[in-house]
């Protein structure tokens, strides 16, 4: 029920690309251009400056985008409120998740959530923690899932699940048979790290600093944009790297990588749900938030002696939100 021309403008403004916008809107590119032109005529203001293949928002366009996003959110909230009167959870839900969460946690949460609420349409984007926080603040998503806290006053962080970062080496690496190394040895070996802005990198740097090791003293051989890339690099013998315990279950079982304990270094963090500071969200976003907090309680993990995550067998069957909340109350 969102005003159609305003929706076309909003999608173009967010993509800054008419071709991408046309694909998202399932319209031809000329139809997108025509709708934008008609809106500009109606308002008497130019909304975009077009220079060759580049599109930028004018001051009027930037101003309108703020209100277009607000209008879209308000209309979606209205539809969700009406659905709630019928006892349904329905509507669109836009999420952003950091890469580790998107790969290893979000799929299991979404799979169960959609079984219970099949009328919800979910769209999700992924990036590093910094990008997820930006998407939330800019209003492009309703909720975010990240590694660690957001560290912003305008963002509320809620813990979902504990994670541990472990150092891994290839099975034929000299450290594989030792199993344990000292911090001084870590400084001598090529290290594969996530890119700046990543929650994984930040938590590793903070832990190393607390242990008296500065990042500048390490031999950072490569900076990579995903956990999978680090695992693959380690398997190929390019160095060692810190990754989430969730990322290496298969590789440890296959024997391609080995977790290495570092004396005096224990890197623990939280996977967290983030939302704008203020009242708890309602509608579809509120339903997902409550479900996610309850779901991760019901499927919490423990680790074996290798630091590999193992699911608690007492919670293999997914619980409904009401059942999980009842269980939480009993355990208090």
Give the location of each predicted region.
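Short helix-boundary/capping micro-motifs
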Residues: 11-28
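A short LG(V/I)-centered, amphipathic sequence patch enriched
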Residues: 40-57, 62
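Central regulatory/effector-binding core of bacterial HTH transcription factors
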Residues: 90-153, 224
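A late-sequence structural motif
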Residues: 105, 258-302
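Hydrophobic hinge/microswitch elements
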Residues: 128-133, 137-141, 146-147, 205-258, ...
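Beta-alpha-beta core module
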Residues: 153-159, 163, 185, 228-277
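Flexible hinge/capping segments at coil-to-helix
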Residues: 154-192, 196
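Secondary-structure junction motif
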Residues: 175, 191-212, 281-283, 298-305, ...
